[in-house]
Amino acid sequence: MKFVAGLVLGLILVPAALYFYLIGGSAPVATTDPDIPFESYLARKAQHVRIDRDMPKTAPIQPTEANYLAGAELYKQHCAVCHGLPDSKKTAIATGMYPRPPQLFMGKGVTDDEPGESYWKIFNGFRLTGMPGFSKSLNETQMWQMALLLANADKLPASVKAALVAPPTATASAASPAASAPAAPATAAQPPR
């Protein structure tokens, strides 16, 4: 009987203590605060399981130079401020974020990901990280162009590498869905499989 009473008391006290910890202002909410124990591990584990389960298995567009170039312009417009460009330092915005956004052209990270994994990340974003989902602002083709660019970042043609470090062009604005009607808007809650 004492065991059952202790178990019930524990089931009440642990959530109550957690609740008061959170509302008492002790929880680390600033970007400069240290991690809660296991926070990073659990977040990464949950991300990988969800992405592996839901990511599209094949890309509906081909990894062509034209798609890489379009993806490069979109990347510069929407992603570079946080994720950087080839051979560039972290921006002030990236340095001040938590978790720190990965610098995607630094030789590790997305180049070993399947295009569908990068697409899932672009489509959905990540809660509480500053990484937005682009499903409401870019169309399917645009998101796949960026996903293919990132998945192949270590083997891009010279013209695409040059486009990544060049100032944004007028084409970047024209590629924006606000400037042109999207061919296939992304309206699903999750990307197609």
Where are these regions (language model features)?
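Periplasmic c-type cytochrome electron-transfer domains
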Residues: 2-69, 93, 113-117, 134-149, ...
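Sequence/structural segment immediately N-terminal to covalent heme-attachment motifs in c-type
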Residues: 65-88, 176-180
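Gly/Gly-Pro-rich "capping" loops immediately C-terminal to redox-active cysteine motifs
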Residues: 68, 72, 84-117, 134
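Sec-exported extracytoplasmic/periplasmic mature domains
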Residues: 76, 80, 123-127, 148-155
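Detector for the c-type heme attachment site
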Residues: 82-88, 123-124, 135-138, 151
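Short, flexible loop/turn segments with low-complexity composition
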Residues: 159-169
